[in-house]
Amino acid sequence: PGPLLSSFAKELSSYLNSGMAILTAIRLIEDQHQHEKKYASFLASLRTMIEEGKSLYHALNSQSVYGMPDFFLQSINVAGQSGKMVPVLIQMGNFFSTQAKIKKQVGNAL
C-alpha cells in the first residue's frame, strides 16, 4: 500500500506538526476519507486502538485492513519512543511517494 502509506504519513505529519494530538489528527483524516471504505476502515481501526490508549505503532501493527512493511512499523516504533514522529512520518511519506513514482516509470518503460 505504498501510495496509501505516503498519503497517510504526509497527512498525519502535517497535523502533528501543527500541534494537533494524534487522536484528533486520525479523526480528521478519517472524516476526509470516509467515502473510501477500505481506507476509512483502516483509519477507524487505528482510531479505536488509540482511543484505548495504544500507541500508533501498536495500532498500525495490530490492524488487519492493510499489510504494513516491517521497516515502516519499526520506524514508527522508534519515532514514538524518541519523540521524532513528525520527521519520521515526513521521511516515510517521501519514501513511499518516490517509490510509487519509480514503479510507475518502470512500468511505463516496459
What residue spans do the PLM features occupy?
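Catalytic metal-binding core of the metallo-beta-lactamase
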Residues: P1-L110
